[in-house]
Protein backbone atom coordinates (compact mmCIF):
# COMPACT_ATOMS: atom_id res chain seq x y z
CA UNK A 1 0.00 0.00 0.00
CA UNK A 2 2.72 2.50 0.94
CA UNK A 3 4.57 1.71 -2.26
CA UNK A 4 1.60 2.92 -4.29
CA UNK A 5 1.61 6.37 -2.67
CA UNK A 6 3.09 9.07 -4.90
CA UNK A 7 6.14 10.96 -3.69
CA UNK A 8 6.53 9.10 -0.41
CA UNK A 9 9.15 11.01 1.53
CA UNK A 10 11.07 8.57 3.70
CA UNK A 11 12.00 11.06 6.41
CA UNK A 12 8.45 12.42 6.76
CA UNK A 13 7.00 9.32 8.43
CA UNK A 14 8.25 6.48 10.61
CA UNK A 15 8.34 3.25 8.63
CA UNK A 16 8.42 -0.19 10.22
CA UNK A 17 8.29 -3.73 8.95
CA UNK A 18 8.91 -7.27 10.21
CA UNK A 19 10.67 -10.54 9.48
CA UNK A 20 8.57 -13.66 10.10
CA UNK A 21 9.87 -17.21 10.71
CA UNK A 22 7.23 -18.66 8.37
CA UNK A 23 8.91 -17.07 5.34
CA UNK A 24 11.60 -18.91 3.33
CA UNK A 25 14.73 -19.41 5.47
CA UNK A 26 12.89 -17.92 8.46
CA UNK A 27 14.98 -15.71 10.74
CA UNK A 28 18.29 -17.02 9.46
CA UNK A 29 20.71 -14.40 8.09
CA UNK A 30 19.59 -15.22 4.55
CA UNK A 31 15.93 -15.13 5.49
CA UNK A 32 16.16 -11.79 7.30
CA UNK A 33 18.04 -10.13 4.45
CA UNK A 34 15.58 -11.48 1.91
CA UNK A 35 12.59 -10.23 3.89
CA UNK A 36 13.96 -6.72 4.45
CA UNK A 37 14.72 -6.40 0.74
CA UNK A 38 11.21 -7.55 -0.14
CA UNK A 39 9.75 -4.93 2.20
CA UNK A 40 11.97 -2.15 0.88
CA UNK A 41 11.03 -2.97 -2.69
CA UNK A 42 7.32 -3.13 -1.85
CA UNK A 43 7.41 0.27 -0.13
CA UNK A 44 9.80 1.72 -2.74
CA UNK A 45 12.19 3.05 -0.11
CA UNK A 46 15.84 2.44 0.69
CA UNK A 47 15.64 2.31 4.50
CA UNK A 48 13.15 1.72 7.32
CA UNK A 49 13.12 3.11 10.84
CA UNK A 50 12.01 -0.04 12.68
CA UNK A 51 12.62 -3.67 11.79
CA UNK A 52 11.05 -6.33 14.03
CA UNK A 53 11.58 -10.01 14.57
CA UNK A 54 7.88 -10.90 14.55
CA UNK A 55 8.19 -13.97 16.76
CA UNK A 56 10.80 -16.58 17.73
CA UNK A 57 12.07 -19.01 15.12
CA UNK A 58 12.43 -22.50 16.58
CA UNK A 59 14.63 -23.57 13.66
CA UNK A 60 17.22 -20.78 13.80
CA UNK A 61 19.55 -19.17 16.31
CA UNK A 62 18.61 -15.91 18.03
CA UNK A 63 22.28 -14.91 18.10
CA UNK A 64 22.56 -15.27 14.32
CA UNK A 65 19.42 -13.18 13.90
CA UNK A 66 20.78 -10.44 16.17
CA UNK A 67 24.12 -10.38 14.36
CA UNK A 68 22.33 -9.92 11.05
CA UNK A 69 20.20 -7.09 12.44
CA UNK A 70 23.35 -5.41 13.74
CA UNK A 71 24.85 -5.59 10.25
CA UNK A 72 21.71 -3.98 8.80
CA UNK A 73 22.02 -1.14 11.32
CA UNK A 74 25.69 -0.63 10.43
CA UNK A 75 24.81 -0.66 6.72
CA UNK A 76 22.15 2.00 7.26
CA UNK A 77 19.31 -0.20 6.03
CA UNK A 78 17.45 -0.03 9.36
CA UNK A 79 17.62 2.38 12.28
CA UNK A 80 15.94 0.52 15.13
CA UNK A 81 15.74 -3.16 16.08
CA UNK A 82 12.46 -4.45 17.42
CA UNK A 83 11.12 -7.69 18.86
CA UNK A 84 7.58 -9.00 19.08
CA UNK A 85 5.91 -12.00 20.73
CA UNK A 86 9.06 -13.16 22.56
CA UNK A 87 9.02 -14.48 26.13
CA UNK A 88 10.52 -12.16 28.74
CA UNK A 89 13.37 -14.59 29.43
CA UNK A 90 14.33 -14.67 25.76
CA UNK A 91 14.11 -10.89 25.52
CA UNK A 92 16.54 -10.63 28.43
CA UNK A 93 18.76 -13.16 26.68
CA UNK A 94 18.71 -10.98 23.56
CA UNK A 95 20.00 -8.02 25.57
CA UNK A 96 22.64 -10.20 27.21
CA UNK A 97 23.82 -11.52 23.83
CA UNK A 98 24.00 -8.00 22.40
CA UNK A 99 26.06 -6.82 25.36
CA UNK A 100 28.35 -9.84 25.14
CA UNK A 101 28.98 -9.52 21.40
CA UNK A 102 28.90 -5.73 21.07
CA UNK A 103 25.73 -5.66 18.97
CA UNK A 104 23.08 -3.00 18.54
CA UNK A 105 20.30 -3.78 21.02
CA UNK A 106 16.54 -3.94 20.49
CA UNK A 107 14.93 -0.68 21.58
CA UNK A 108 11.24 -1.40 20.96
CA UNK A 109 8.97 -4.37 21.66
CA UNK A 110 5.53 -4.81 20.10
CA UNK A 111 3.25 -6.92 22.27
CA UNK A 112 -0.29 -7.99 23.12
CA UNK A 113 -1.78 -5.64 25.72
CA UNK A 114 -5.30 -4.44 26.44
CA UNK A 115 -7.75 -4.36 29.39
CA UNK A 116 -8.62 -8.04 28.79
CA UNK A 117 -5.01 -9.23 28.56
CA UNK A 118 -2.41 -7.77 30.90
CA UNK A 119 0.05 -10.67 30.98
CA UNK A 120 3.02 -8.46 30.06
CA UNK A 121 2.76 -6.32 33.19
CA UNK A 122 4.48 -8.53 35.76
CA UNK A 123 6.92 -10.45 33.57
CA UNK A 124 7.86 -8.63 30.37
CA UNK A 125 7.60 -4.91 31.14
CA UNK A 126 10.17 -5.01 33.98
CA UNK A 127 12.69 -6.60 31.59
CA UNK A 128 12.06 -3.88 29.01
CA UNK A 129 12.30 -1.11 31.60
CA UNK A 130 15.59 -2.45 32.95
CA UNK A 131 17.06 -2.44 29.45
CA UNK A 132 15.74 0.90 28.18
CA UNK A 133 13.36 -0.67 25.69
CA UNK A 134 9.96 0.84 24.87
CA UNK A 135 6.72 -1.12 24.45
CA UNK A 136 4.04 -0.71 21.78
CA UNK A 137 0.70 -2.37 22.50
CA UNK A 138 -1.10 -4.21 19.72
CA UNK A 139 -4.69 -5.50 19.87
CA UNK A 140 -5.66 -2.53 22.10
CA UNK A 141 -9.34 -3.40 21.57
CA UNK A 142 -8.78 -7.16 21.93
CA UNK A 143 -9.15 -7.67 18.17
CA UNK A 144 -12.52 -5.90 18.29
CA UNK A 145 -13.97 -7.58 21.37
CA UNK A 146 -13.88 -4.27 23.24
CA UNK A 147 -15.92 -2.49 20.58
CA UNK A 148 -19.12 -4.00 22.00
CA UNK A 149 -19.86 -5.67 18.69
CA UNK A 150 -19.18 -9.16 20.04
CA UNK A 151 -21.20 -9.74 23.18
CA UNK A 152 -22.24 -13.39 22.91
CA UNK A 153 -19.74 -16.23 22.92
CA UNK A 154 -21.83 -18.31 20.54
CA UNK A 155 -22.17 -15.70 17.80
CA UNK A 156 -19.17 -15.09 15.55
CA UNK A 157 -19.80 -11.86 13.69
CA UNK A 158 -18.05 -10.38 10.67
CA UNK A 159 -14.55 -9.12 11.25
CA UNK A 160 -11.25 -10.54 12.39
CA UNK A 161 -12.83 -13.42 14.31
CA UNK A 162 -14.84 -14.54 11.28
CA UNK A 163 -11.94 -14.20 8.86
CA UNK A 164 -9.20 -15.57 11.11
CA UNK A 165 -10.50 -18.57 13.10
CA UNK A 166 -7.32 -19.02 15.14
CA UNK A 167 -8.17 -15.71 16.83
CA UNK A 168 -11.28 -17.24 18.40
CA UNK A 169 -9.53 -19.15 21.23
CA UNK A 170 -7.50 -16.03 22.05
CA UNK A 171 -10.53 -13.92 22.89
CA UNK A 172 -13.81 -15.83 22.41
CA UNK A 173 -13.83 -17.45 25.84
CA UNK A 174 -16.56 -17.59 28.50
CA UNK A 175 -14.31 -15.69 30.91
CA UNK A 176 -13.74 -12.88 28.42
CA UNK A 177 -17.46 -12.49 27.77
CA UNK A 178 -18.20 -12.53 31.49
CA UNK A 179 -15.59 -9.79 31.90
CA UNK A 180 -17.08 -7.84 28.99
CA UNK A 181 -20.47 -7.72 30.70
CA UNK A 182 -18.90 -5.95 33.69
CA UNK A 183 -17.12 -3.43 31.50
CA UNK A 184 -20.14 -2.83 29.27
CA UNK A 185 -22.39 -2.17 32.25
CA UNK A 186 -19.96 0.28 33.86
CA UNK A 187 -19.38 2.11 30.57
CA UNK A 188 -23.10 2.46 29.93
CA UNK A 189 -23.60 3.84 33.43
CA UNK A 190 -20.83 6.39 32.82
CA UNK A 191 -22.07 7.17 29.29
CA UNK A 192 -18.71 6.23 27.76
CA UNK A 193 -18.26 3.82 24.86
CA UNK A 194 -16.14 0.72 25.51
CA UNK A 195 -13.81 1.81 22.71
CA UNK A 196 -13.14 5.16 24.34
CA UNK A 197 -12.89 3.61 27.80
CA UNK A 198 -10.34 1.08 26.54
CA UNK A 199 -8.12 3.74 24.98
CA UNK A 200 -8.44 5.95 28.02
CA UNK A 201 -7.45 3.01 30.24
CA UNK A 202 -4.42 2.25 28.07
CA UNK A 203 -3.24 5.84 27.80
CA UNK A 204 -4.02 7.06 31.33
CA UNK A 205 -4.26 4.13 33.74
CA UNK A 206 -2.29 1.15 32.41
CA UNK A 207 1.35 0.19 32.94
CA UNK A 208 2.38 1.98 29.75
CA UNK A 209 4.72 4.93 30.01
CA UNK A 210 3.11 7.41 27.63
CA UNK A 211 5.00 10.73 27.57
CA UNK A 212 6.67 9.80 30.84
CA UNK A 213 9.46 11.94 32.23
CA UNK A 214 11.72 8.89 32.06
CA UNK A 215 11.40 8.89 28.27
CA UNK A 216 10.18 5.32 28.09
CA UNK A 217 8.26 6.25 24.96
CA UNK A 218 5.64 3.50 25.01
CA UNK A 219 2.81 3.57 22.49
CA UNK A 220 -0.41 2.02 21.27
CA UNK A 221 -0.83 0.52 17.81
CA UNK A 222 -4.14 1.93 16.58
CA UNK A 223 -5.74 -0.21 13.89
CA UNK A 224 -8.89 0.09 11.84
CA UNK A 225 -10.71 -1.58 8.96
CA UNK A 226 -12.18 1.67 7.66
CA UNK A 227 -11.47 5.39 7.62
CA UNK A 228 -14.44 5.93 9.92
CA UNK A 229 -13.02 3.52 12.50
CA UNK A 230 -9.60 5.13 12.29
CA UNK A 231 -11.02 8.61 12.82
CA UNK A 232 -13.08 7.45 15.81
CA UNK A 233 -10.12 5.63 17.37
CA UNK A 234 -7.96 8.73 16.99
CA UNK A 235 -10.67 10.89 18.53
CA UNK A 236 -10.83 8.52 21.50
CA UNK A 237 -7.06 8.73 21.91
CA UNK A 238 -7.27 12.50 21.74
CA UNK A 239 -9.89 12.62 24.47
CA UNK A 240 -7.76 10.28 26.57
CA UNK A 241 -4.90 12.77 26.41
CA UNK A 242 -7.09 15.57 27.76
CA UNK A 243 -5.43 16.61 31.02
CA UNK A 244 -8.67 17.35 32.86
CA UNK A 245 -11.12 14.82 31.45
CA UNK A 246 -8.97 11.99 30.13
CA UNK A 247 -8.99 9.83 33.24
CA UNK A 248 -11.79 7.31 33.73
CA UNK A 249 -14.40 7.44 36.51
CA UNK A 250 -13.58 5.12 39.40
CA UNK A 251 -16.53 2.74 38.73
CA UNK A 252 -15.21 2.10 35.21
CA UNK A 253 -11.69 1.54 36.53
CA UNK A 254 -13.07 -0.87 39.11
CA UNK A 255 -14.89 -2.76 36.34
CA UNK A 256 -11.67 -3.10 34.34
CA UNK A 257 -9.85 -4.45 37.40
CA UNK A 258 -12.63 -6.92 38.19
CA UNK A 259 -12.76 -8.02 34.55
CA UNK A 260 -9.04 -8.81 34.51
CA UNK A 261 -9.33 -10.81 37.72
CA UNK A 262 -12.04 -12.95 36.12
CA UNK A 263 -9.85 -13.71 33.11
CA UNK A 264 -6.65 -14.17 35.07
CA UNK A 265 -8.25 -16.66 37.45
CA UNK A 266 -10.08 -18.62 34.77
CA UNK A 267 -9.10 -22.27 35.25
CA UNK A 268 -10.36 -23.44 31.85
CA UNK A 269 -8.03 -21.60 29.51
CA UNK A 270 -6.70 -18.46 31.17
CA UNK A 271 -5.51 -15.42 29.23
CA UNK A 272 -3.80 -15.94 25.89
CA UNK A 273 0.01 -15.72 26.28
CA UNK A 274 1.87 -12.67 25.02
CA UNK A 275 4.65 -14.83 23.53
CA UNK A 276 4.97 -17.48 20.82
CA UNK A 277 7.43 -20.37 20.80
CA UNK A 278 11.21 -19.82 21.26
CA UNK A 279 14.42 -19.70 19.25
CA UNK A 280 16.34 -22.89 18.48
CA UNK A 281 19.20 -21.91 20.80
CA UNK A 282 17.01 -20.85 23.76
CA UNK A 283 18.26 -22.56 26.95
CA UNK A 284 15.57 -24.23 29.04
CA UNK A 285 12.96 -23.89 26.31
CA UNK A 286 11.40 -27.21 27.28
CA UNK A 287 10.17 -25.69 30.54
CA UNK A 288 8.23 -22.87 28.84
CA UNK A 289 4.51 -23.68 28.70
CA UNK A 290 2.29 -21.60 26.44
CA UNK A 291 -0.89 -22.82 28.11
CA UNK A 292 -4.30 -24.11 27.12
CA UNK A 293 -5.54 -21.08 25.19
CA UNK A 294 -2.49 -21.07 22.90
CA UNK A 295 -2.73 -24.80 22.28
CA UNK A 296 -6.40 -24.40 21.40
CA UNK A 297 -5.52 -21.70 18.87
CA UNK A 298 -2.81 -23.85 17.28
CA UNK A 299 -5.30 -26.69 16.88
CA UNK A 300 -7.53 -24.56 14.63
Where are the language model's segments positioned?
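N-terminal binding-site loop/beta-alpha segment at the start of enzyme catalytic domains
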Residues: 1-14, 298-300
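Conserved, mostly hydrophobic/aromatic
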Residues: 2, 15, 39, 48, ...
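Structural motif corresponding to the early beta-alpha repeats
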Residues: 8, 12-30
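Helix C-cap/helix->beta junction micro-motif
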Residues: 9-11, 75-76, 131, 190
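Glycine-rich beta-alpha junction loops
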Residues: 21, 87, 112-117, 139-146, ...
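Glycine/proline-rich, positively charged
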Residues: 23-119, 123, 133
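Aromatic-lined glycan-binding groove of carbohydrate-active enzymes
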Residues: 120-160, 185, 192-193
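Terminal-tail/helix-coil boundary detector
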Residues: 130, 159-178, 182-185, 189, ...
